Regions:
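Bacterial Sec-dependent N-terminal signal peptides
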Residues: 1-21
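Short, conserved catalytic-motif segment at the N-terminal edge
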Residues: 20-77, 98-100, 199-202, 278, ...
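Short active-site loop at a secondary-structure junction
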Residues: 32-45, 64-127, 205-218, 295-298
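Structural recognition of the beta-strand scaffold that forms the well-ordered cores
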Residues: 43-45, 54-55, 76, 124-127, ...
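Short, solvent-exposed loop/turn and secondary-structure capping segments
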Residues: 55-58, 135-141, 253-255, 396, ...
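Short, surface-exposed loop or secondary-structure junction motifs
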Residues: 117-370
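Structured C-terminal helix/loop/strand segments within mature extracytoplasmic catalytic/sensor domains
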Residues: 375-432
Length: 432
């Protein structure tokens, strides 16, 4: 008995030391990124079999170093929204037999009906190989032809009134027809979504299918699909079906409207070409901003722990906290590769490891199993779940602060290097 107790104590001590060493190694890479101006601050949360391996923070909210990064900080998730919001509703419809993944998208999305995209299979669109445009810079179409164009020159942020907007787009003050706040001095026309965004998506060109080309256009249409299919507001439906039962309190849209203190939200870019302000508590993505901050493309905010709850549920095969959200087969269908023979590595909405690993192009470790899945975000975020090792990796940063031109997070391979540390740790402690 004494030998068993001694062995247990030694094993516990070894595990604690190993986890401490892991945290120190993660922190060193984060600090390397901060020193290289990859981001002013960041955090990593890693779980194995649902238990925390490490939760490491480094740096500050901005380079002014006024507020240190804290574990419960809330981040703009950017494109992690794609797999954390409206796609979950599509998964529900599929599970209930109400969506055929090989049916044409025009059957489910009225905006696509009668267009050059109407007959494209939904499976092809979700796998990013349908030839649809990656994105549309909707806001640029709001400027008059003789308006000053800040992308092409140094812009004086104090001269925002130099903008000349087309009718029924923006104005400087709110009114009955311009009730949607984008910024304090920028209010959007009430039907802008239908008049401009949906119209631009309908008219957008299509290239031949078969080549991988990341596109976010379908995800702009998911809020309408949810609201028309459920009779419930988009965000309200997601909260009711997923976020609230998971206990993911910070996960959601428009954080300031939900009472999250501005001091807990990490700022993103100092916008010098559209909103002319530091983006803090409002969505970074321009397209999502024009959707009133609520889109299937971008717009979600969350802490690391709350984002982890959603992906731990997916990693568990659809179950979390004694409640089943999806069948395991549904998650398997959406997180597997569908066009691997074409060299396409994507699942349905979800990102996957490259078919052939390329260290210069991958955001995940080479050790990530073919069954693993997740998504990254333009603001410097990533979440990755690996059923092969029962490992969950959450990386949150604001790499676009103060400017989206900061690229060191990619050139230094910050995320895949930290991800690789986690796999090596599992091998070293024998918990693979």
């Amino acid at each position: 008995m004494r030998k068993f107790l001694l062995f247990s104590l030694l094993l516990t001590s070894f595990t604690s030391l190993a986890q401490s060493s892991l945290a120190d190694s993660i922190r060193l890479i984060l600090e390397e990124g901060i020193a290289a101006d990859a981001f002013p601050g960041a955090q990593v949360l890693a779980l194995h079999k649902g238990e925390v391996l490490a939760h490491v923070t480094a740096g500050h909210h901005t380079y002014a170093n006024h507020r240190p990064t804290q574990k419960d900080d809330v981040y703009d998730l950017a494109s992690i929204t794609k797999t954390s919001s409206g796609l979950l509703y599509l998964m529900q419809l599929y599970e209930r037999g109400r969506v055929d993944l090989d049916a044409p998208v025009g059957q489910y999305f009225p905006v696509f009906a009668g267009t050059n995209k109407a007959d494209i299979p939904l499976r092809s669109v979700l796998s990013h190989r349908a030839g649809i445009l990656p994105w549309v810079p909707y806001w640029q179409g709001t400027l008059k032809g003789n308006g000053r164009y800040p992308w092409k020159k140094s812009w004086d942020t104090q001269r925002t009134n130099d903008y000349r907007f087309r009718g029924r787009t923006f104005q400087r003050d709110s009114s009955r027809n311009y009730p949607i706040r984008v910024m304090d001095d920028l209010w959007m026309y009430r039907n802008f979504r239908e008049r401009s965004i949906y119209r631009a998506i309908r008219k957008s060109p299509v290239k031949p299918a078969g080549n991988y080309a990341y596109s976010g256009l379908l995800f702009y249409l998911l809020p309408q699909l949810v609201e028309e299919g459920t009779g419930v507001g988009y965000h309200a439906y997601l909260r009711e079906q997923f976020y609230d039962p998971l206990g993911a309190e910070t996960l959601g849209y428009r954080p300031l409207d939900r009472g999250i203190p501005l001091s807990k939200i990490v700022p993103t870019e100092i916008d010098t070409f559209f909103r002319m302000a530091t983006l803090h508590g409002v969505v970074h993505d321009e397209g999502a901003a024009l959707m009133n901050g609520v889109s299937g493309n971008a717009g979600l905010f969350s802490s690391a722990a709350d984002l982890a709850k959603l992906y731990q549920m997916l990693l568990n095969g659809g179950e979390y906290g004694g409640r089943r959200y999806f069948k395991e087969s549904t998650i398997g269908e959406f997180t597997r590769r569908h066009y691997e023979a074409e060299g396409n590595h994507r699942g349905l909405g979800f990102d996957k490891p490259l078919v052939e690993y390329d260290p210069d192009a991958s955001s995940v470790a080479e050790a990530a199993s073919p069954t693993s899945f997740g998504h990254s975000g333009y603001t410097g975020t990533m979440v990755w779940a690996d059923p092969g090792t029962d490992l969950l990796f959450v990386f949150l940063s604001n790499r676009v602060h103060p400017s989206r031109n900061r690229r060191a997070i990619y050139t230094l391979g910050i995320r895949p290097r930290i991800h690789a540390l986690l796999y090596r740790h599992l091998v070293e402690v024998g918990n693979h």
